[in-house]
């Protein structure tokens, strides 16, 4: 749990994958490879699970030639691609995605929406926060509109 609710309560059933801030859980001095294992562990993946998904994570993030480069040298787009790839390949029952796709280019945003559709079709829950109405309409079957916190 990141923070306690200010009121009410929530119950979660299943593993949660989150992408709330670009690169949260990444260490800038570590390579992409090392950060996949670090971030995967923080998100609750076992070492075996990370290793099993490693090649797919790297391919999805499109950072193959930079995998052993420290992430402090990554562009913001590379950073968010890697962060999304790790979170999405966690195979969570609940995936939280908050506005981070605004950083990626249009092709990667489309790829991410495709992955989120896969997650959704597998019967998992996605909590997707966005100002992109087209993305919301294409992905979501239910929505909440918040205006000034209400």
Regions from the PLM with identified roles:
Residues 6-14:
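ABC nucleotide-binding domain "signature motif"
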Residues 17, 37, 49-66, 83-85:
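Conserved ABC ATPase "signature" region
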Residues 86-97:
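A short, proline-enriched helix->beta-strand linker immediately N-terminal to the Walker B motif
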Residues 109-122:
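Helical segment within the ABC ATPase nucleotide-binding domain
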Residues 132-138:
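Conserved H-loop
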Residues 138-145:
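Conserved catalytic segment of ABC-fold P-loop ATPases
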Residues 148-149:
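Conserved ABC ATPase "signature" C-loop
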């Amino acid at each position: 749990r990141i923070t306690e609710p200010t009121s009410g309560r929530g119950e979660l059933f299943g593993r949660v994958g989150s992408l709330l801030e670009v690169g949260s859980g990444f260490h800038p001095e570590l390579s992409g490879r090392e950060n996949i294992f670090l971030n995967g562990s923080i998100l609750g993946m076992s070492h075996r699970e990370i290793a099993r998904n490693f090649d797919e994570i790297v391919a999805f993030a499109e950072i193959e030639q930079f995998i052993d480069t420290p992430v402090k040298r990554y562009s913001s787009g590379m950073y968010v691609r890697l962060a999304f790839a790790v979170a999405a390949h966690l195979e969570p029952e609940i995936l939280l995605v908050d506005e981070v796709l605004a950083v990626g280019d249009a092709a990667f945003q489309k790829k991410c929406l495709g992955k989120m559709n896969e997650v959704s079709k597998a019967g998992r829950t996605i909590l997707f926060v966005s100002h992109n109405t087209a993305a919301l309409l294409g992905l979501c079957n239910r929505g909440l509109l918040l205006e000034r916190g209400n």
